[in-house]
Amino acid sequence: PKEFDEFCEMYKEIRLPFWMQTRPETINNENIKKLAEVGLHRISFGVEHGNEEFRAKVLDRRWKNKDIIERLKIPHKYGLSFSVNNITGFPTETKKLAFDTIELNRQIDADNANIYTFVPFHGTPLRRMCEDLGLIKPETITKCLVEKSVLNMSQYPAHEIEEIKKCFALYVKFPKNRWKEIERAEKNDKEGNRIYEELKVEYLEKYMPKPDANPHGGLEDFKKVENPNYSIDIPGEARPGSKDDLNYH
């Protein structure tokens, strides 16, 4: 678009590193290359959910997983790191459906994979859906992105949502033969928390970037470090919600 070309032409005189948020379907090789050349160093992608049918029906986002996976290979070509934003606890969702989000993230080479609790903001279609289904009272005011679910869903109660969030990064990165351990680590009891802490230490050792790799480098740094090691969020540590999350509730 004209505005995109005008931005790139203008910003090449500034060249301060910048970060942006978008959706996978908006990018291609040409526009990411141009943005990297004028200072883009990091991207956050709103994927939100990994089940195609659920994503289309509930979120009105009609894109195939295979297309998301292919588009998210593009940033690495230009030395750009990126994160993927996911949400769980949507109305009518189940824990089984949440694992489709885990499966999709396992196929994406992001350096961070975030997951947040769905927040039913007033004035959105999903808020009306929640009220129509009796999952929330009309007078209930939502607060922030990192709080427990405010929805009353018997098929996916708040404690199960917290279990998925707690171990999301572990499920994404560890091989599936470790999933039984991770499942036990979901539980907020003495044994579950002990296993979780052990897995967290192992995760940090295996999947955090090495000192000589700069995951925020951009094109110039990418030429110096051709195979940076990417990681995802430290499990169990909450990150502030992004504006990208807010757009699709």
Enumerate the language-model features and the residues they cover.
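Radical SAM enzyme core and accessory elements
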Residues: 139, 143-249
